[in-house]
C-alpha cells in the first residue's frame, strides 16, 4: 500500500467562473508544487481541457485523472471521473445531448476558453456551461458508471449546488460509494448530522477556480495499492476494486 495526496475537483479557464489564468498547465503545476500526487480537472459539463491538462501533468510528474463537474436536472453538482481523456470525451458526447444550450454572455459570466498545453487558446465553448442538464441524479450516475467512470456528489458541505443543500439529506439512490468534501474539517460534523454519510467513503476536492484557491500544501491523502500509476490506483480505489 502507498499514501497518495489527492485533489479530485478543479476548474480551468474553460469554466466561465474560472479565472482566465487558470490554464490547465498552471492547474497541474500548482498541484505538483503543493505535493499532490493525483489531481483531476473537472470543468462544468465539459472535458475539453483535459488533454492539455494531461500533457502538462505528465511533463510535471503529476498523475492526472480526467473529469467533469456535471450539473444534474435537480441543479446538483456531481463529479464524474475517468482514467483517460478518450473515455472522458466519449462521456461528454453523451452529456452534450442533455445540455440546455444557452448562448454564453461573456461580459456577464466570463470566458470559456479551450487551450492547449502551451497555454494557447484554440477555441471557446459558445454555450453557457454550468447550467443544469436534463440528466437526473440517477441518470447521470448510471451514464458515468456504464461508460467506465465513477460518479459522486460534489462538495456536500457547501450551500450552493450541493446534494444536501438541495435535497436536505443524502438519498438512498444513487448508491454513491463516495461523498466529496470541500473542507475536511466538515467531515465528522456532517457524518454526525446526516447518518447516510457514515456509510460512504470520503474524498476531497478543492473546487479551485483561481490560482490562490489551490492549497499551497496537499491537505488530503488516501491509502491505495502499489500497482500502476498513482492515478490508476486511485481510480481503482474509487471503483472499489
Segments from the language model and where they lie:
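Charged catalytic cores and adjacent phosphate/nucleic-acid-binding surfaces used
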Residues: 1-8, 12-30, 34-36, 47-90, ...
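Conserved Rossmann-like nucleotide-binding pocket used by diverse enzymes
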Residues: 40
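Active-site gating loops and adjacent loop-to-helix segments of metal-dependent hydrolytic enzymes
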Residues: 83-125, 168-169
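Alpha-helix-centered segments that form part of catalytic cores
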Residues: 111-146
Amino acid at each position: 500500500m502507498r499514501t497518495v495526496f489527492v485533489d479530485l475537483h478543479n476548474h480551468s479557464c474553460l469554466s466561465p467562473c474560472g479565472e482566465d489564468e487558470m490554464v490547465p498547465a498552471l492547474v497541474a503545476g500548482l498541484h505538483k508544487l503543493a505535493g499532490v500526487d493525483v489531481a483531476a480537472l473537472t470543468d462544468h459539463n465539459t472535458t475539453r481541457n483535459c488533454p492539455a491538462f494531461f500533457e502538462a501533468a505528465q511533463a510535471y510528474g503529476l498523475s492526472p485523472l480526467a473529469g467533469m463537474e456535471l450539473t444534474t436536472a435537480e441543479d446538483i453538482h456531481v463529479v464524474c471521473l475517468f482514467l483517460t481523456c478518450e473515455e472522458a470525451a466519449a462521456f461528454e458526447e453523451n452529456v452534450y445531448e442533455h445540455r440546455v444550450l444557452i448562448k454564453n454572455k461573456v461580459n456577464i459570466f466570463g470566458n470559456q476558453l479551450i487551450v492547449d498545453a502551451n497555454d494557447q487558446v484554440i477555441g471557446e465553448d459558445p454555450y453557457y456551461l454550468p447550467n443544469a442538464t436534463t440528466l437526473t441524479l440517477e441518470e447521470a450516475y448510471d451514464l458515468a458508471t456504464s461508460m467506465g467512470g465513477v460518479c459522486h456528489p460534489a462538495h456536500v458541505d457547501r450551500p450552493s449546488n450541493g446534494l444536501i443543500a438541495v435535497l436536505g439529506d443524502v438519498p438512498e439512490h444513487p448508491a454513491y460509494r463516495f461523498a466529496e468534501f470541500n473542507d475536511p474539517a466538515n467531515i465528522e460534523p456532517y457524518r454526525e448530522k446526516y447518518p447516510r454519510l457514515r456509510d460512504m467513503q470520503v474524498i476531497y476536492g478543492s473546487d479551485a477556480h483561481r490560482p490562490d484557491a489551490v492549497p499551497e500544501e496537499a491537505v488530503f491523502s488516501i491509502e491505495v495499492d502499489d500497482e500502476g500509476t498513482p492515478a490508476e490506483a486511485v481510480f481503482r480505489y474509487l471503483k472499489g476494486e
